[in-house]
């Protein structure tokens, strides 16, 4: 089984690759259209700026390729946000529009931004992504932007207000 990690130029690729290797796979880090289309599973990680990540995907001619993917596709952190339609970052930015939901600066109230730490995640509906993971398990977060709760939300967490911790539409998580 082939696993491709899309290189957005702004992520912790080594950590992701190592984690996938520990699961018994030999992932390939790539921006090659051929690699992505032939992969059995695809990961889109990201840390930092949505603007920078979208620019790399655009320069690599991957924006439309990603939208056409039929295989399981997992966006991690910023990668999940990129699946949305729009980000309020950088005075507004169009994203991949796979999930019709905006990404806004996290409403942290009096809590500090970025949100940095472990949160309990509430699973909203059964999903293969959370198979063998207990409801209210802790996950690590480091972000200033979030995806609102929508019909695509499969898990949520609270940091002043609830936001999507995981989303899913068809083969995209």
From Swiss-Prot:
Subcellular location: Cytoplasm
SUPFAM superfamilies assigned: Class I glutamine amidotransferase-like (SSF52317)
Residues forming the catalytic site: 77 (nucleophile)
Gene3D superfamilies given in the database record: 3.40.50.880
GO molecular function term, any single one: lyase activity
Pathway: Amino-acid biosynthesis; L-histidine biosynthesis; L-histidine from 5-phospho-alpha-D-ribose 1-diphosphate: step 5/9
GO biological process, one term: L-histidine biosynthetic process
Gene Ontology, cellular component aspect: cytoplasm
Catalytic activity: 5-[(5-phospho-1-deoxy-D-ribulos-1-ylimino)methylamino]-1-(5-phospho-beta-D-ribosyl)imidazole-4-carboxamide + L-glutamine = D-erythro-1-(imidazol-4-yl)glycerol 3-phosphate + 5-amino-1-(5-phospho-beta-D-ribosyl)imidazole-4-carboxamide + L-glutamate + H(+); L-glutamine + H2O = L-glutamate + NH4(+)
Top-rank taxon: Bacteria
E.C. code: 4.3.2.10, 3.5.1.2
PROSITE patterns for the chain: GATASE_TYPE_1
Domain Glutamine amidotransferase type-1 residues, every copy: 2-173
Pfam families, A to Z: GATase
Signal peptide residue numbers: none
Keyword tags: Amino-acid biosynthesis, Cytoplasm, Glutamine amidotransferase, Histidine biosynthesis, Hydrolase, Lyase
Biological function: IGPS catalyzes the conversion of PRFAR and glutamine to IGP, AICAR and glutamate. The HisH subunit catalyzes the hydrolysis of glutamine to glutamate and ammonia as part of the synthesis of IGP and AICAR. The resulting ammonia molecule is channeled to the active site of HisF.
Assembly with partners or alone: Heterodimer of HisH and HisF.
Name this polypeptide is given: Imidazole glycerol phosphate synthase subunit HisH
GN (gene name): hisH
